[in-house]
Amino acid sequence: MPEHLSPREILDRLVAFPTVSTDSNLALVDWVEAWLAGWGIASHRVYNAEGSKAALYASVGPDVPGGVILSGHTDVVPVEGQDWHSDPWTVIERDGRLYGRGVCDMKGFDALALAALPLALEAGVKRPLQIALSYDEELGCTGALPMIRAMAAGLPRAAAVIVGEPSMMKVVTGHKGGHSFRVHLRGHEVHSSILHEGVSAIMQGARLIDWANRMNAENAARPATELGALFYPHWTTLHVGTISGGTAENITAKDCSFGLGFRVVPGEDPLDWVARLKAEAARITAEMQAVHPDAGITLEEKFVVTPLVPEQDGAAEALARRLTGDNAVRVVSYGTEAGHFQSEGYSAVVCGPGDIAQAHQPDEWLAVDQFAAGWQFMQDVVKDLCR
């Protein structure tokens, strides 16, 4: 028998699962799968290599092309170290806001999308409504591509993808791409009084970080491209967020590692930036090995987030603008899974409830009126699919 749940009741269920990216999401997937099965809606899983996490997708309606995909992710960021004033795994409504980890990013949208499936079933849509729920979005959208490719192989191709990251229900047509590396440096230890006989992994790493700073300065000084001018900032940025290494102050560091990330403006080739990084690392490595042959630099690729490029006459943009009435041009500098959908041949935009400023914060919240606006959008999507 189907279990009739409101969007808010579904949100309560989803938030109760602590699906931090470092942990499994299978308990949540089990619940979603069982709830959909109660409505007679079949769902499909796409597991990670270890079988510890899964993406889930489902479809309601006839097996014809031209439908709509509602895309969200199941994982959330940790709450450790944050000062919460209520249980982060229980949705609390207070002063027109819904509080809880993931309510904004992005279980609020997930709940609305799930609630829309029985609505589409009962309405008898003429084109399918599909849902896509990924894992590891917060770790670099690493769970998205296998899911997207499975959907492309197993379902009729949708005309539009709505990725429901928080945008205040405004239509976002472009975002920067992301490329993340962990840089590992191997040095050669000697007493720091004879520094010239050793190789400090930290000091050599600082040279690569200085290169990143110089690239930022050069990029900022260049005039914006027509597409780049839409973004803030309008240039590709390089950033080092974490670093570790060394043994003692009087020993040249035998190791150093740091995270280096790119946010690439659409229109620039991310692989060109990778080539530049590799060339600079090779140049520094050669100088390190001139002192000691075992010294060097290894680049470990962590993830790639494909940029979302504004489309000419895109079906997803046309649908989202028609249903929201929003015709302003908007792009963002953070990444989403919309770029991956677009790279696989889908028309995609970002449009979802909530403000990105609330994502990842202690006492994360979603305005009740945004949740209501998102539900109205879902109802309008279903009506559109009935035409």
Model features per residue range: what roles?
Residues 1-101, 119-126, 355:
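Acidic/His- and Gly-rich active-site-bordering loop/insert found
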Residues 2, 49, 182-387:
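Metal-dependent amide/peptide-bond hydrolase catalytic core
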Residues 51, 74-75, 97, 132-141, ...:
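Acidic, glycine-rich active-site loops and adjacent beta-strand->loop/helix elements
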Residues 79-94, 158, 173-185:
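Acidic-glycine-rich active-site phosphate/pyrophosphate-binding loop
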Residues 96-112, 351:
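Glycine/serine-rich anion-binding loops at beta->alpha junctions
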Residues 106-180, 386:
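Acidic/histidine-rich catalytic neighborhood of metal-dependent amide-processing enzymes
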